[in-house]
Regions:
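Short terminal targeting/anchoring segments
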Residues: 1-32
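Long, low-hydrophobicity, acidic/polar, solvent-exposed interaction domains
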Residues: 23-189
Length: 197
């Protein structure tokens, strides 16, 4: 039996399967995670400066150990971040909150901690993240408008413009310090934030 063409057939089948097979790509969140630091002792954070958000396996939201609806989370986060309850060097000059001594000192010291169960629905997890990012963006927009009243754009618009590859280098150089100044004030969400380099 002549088997000379068997290699050709096997090669053609291999080519056929390589061409017709689709390769699935993983989908997920595009987040920049902070690099590992060589700090041995963790920083001391006052309990009142931590805003804890927990999503359990039943998709129930607990904020500061109290049940809350997702649509109420943004306002609660803004209230916490903008409290400005610090005294002396911890005081916040730009905060417009209630200055409650039992809540955060200032946005630079405030930390939002998001924890979820493994069985939490992905869409609920994303909805909670979106509300927390929106709370930061509300405050960033307000502070950006206060510091740059003649610019005529919000922080989010300026950030989008800075990230756009079509934006000229001179415009990026102009936006960079303005964006960085606001970002420094509102950085301690446990979700990664944009770094302007």
């Amino acid at each position: 039996v002549n088997a000379g063409s068997m290699a050709d057939i096997a090669f053609l089948l291999l080519i056929f399967f390589l061409v017709t097979t689709t390769i699935e790509t993983d989908s997920g969140l595009n987040r920049k995670i902070p690099p590992m630091e060589d700090i041995i002792d963790p920083p001391i954070i006052k309990e009142r400066n931590i805003f804890t958000v927990v999503v359990n396996k039943n998709n129930d939201l607990l904020v500061e150990e109290k049940p809350m609806q997702i649509d109420e989370l943004r306002e609660a986060a803004v209230t916490f971040l903008d409290n400005g309850g610090g005294k002396g060097e911890d005081a916040c000059s730009f905060c417009q909150g209630e200055r409650d001594p039992n809540s955060s000192d200032n946005p630079e010291k405030a930390v939002i901690s998001l924890k979820n169960d493994r069985e939490t629905d992905y869409k609920v997890y994303i909805a909670v993240q979106n509300e927390l990012v929106a709370a930061y963006n509300i405050l960033r927009n307000r502070e950006f408008a206060r510091l740059n009243p003649n610019l005529g754009m919000s922080f989010v618009e300026a950030d989008r413009k800075y990230s756009d590859p079509r934006t000229s280098l001179s415009q990026k150089e102009s936006l960079k310090p303005k964006l960085s100044e606001v970002t420094v004030s509102y950085t301690h969400l446990t979700l990664p934030t944009t770094e302007y380099v």
